[in-house]
Amino acid sequence: MAGSSTNKDVVLHFLTDVFVNHDMTRLDEYLRDDYIQHNPDCPQGKAGFVKFFDVIFRAMPDFRYHVREVVADGDMVMAWVTTQGTHTGSEFLGQAAGGNPVKFDAVDIFRMQDGLIAEHWDVADTFTFFSQLGIVQGAEDRQRKE
């Protein structure tokens, strides 16, 4: 289980550096050169990762992950996180900054190889996220109109 503990530590440091401190300068310490991203909205590789999150960080300068739980088993690591931020920066998904606060949960799953993140999958509550940004109508708004 020592490998699982080490893998868990790598993921925790990665999440803190990237999603709390917005530091993309150390990605070589966390991501393999052939890193595979399974989120269809995020381009492949390190450069795609940086591009994707640069847009989010510019739109929500206070974007942060709160790590709720991390579980490791062999080469797999799962993190349950709450994402929080405020759309006060640049345009995002066609929406001008409106000061909308966002808060939603996500689960990130990482496959580790040789101490680095080789693959990533995620499941995020994008309906809540997009509703809070005003991109889609939230369930509460629909019920009020009916």
Predicted regions and their residues:
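C-terminal and inter-domain tail/linker signature
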Residues: M1-E146
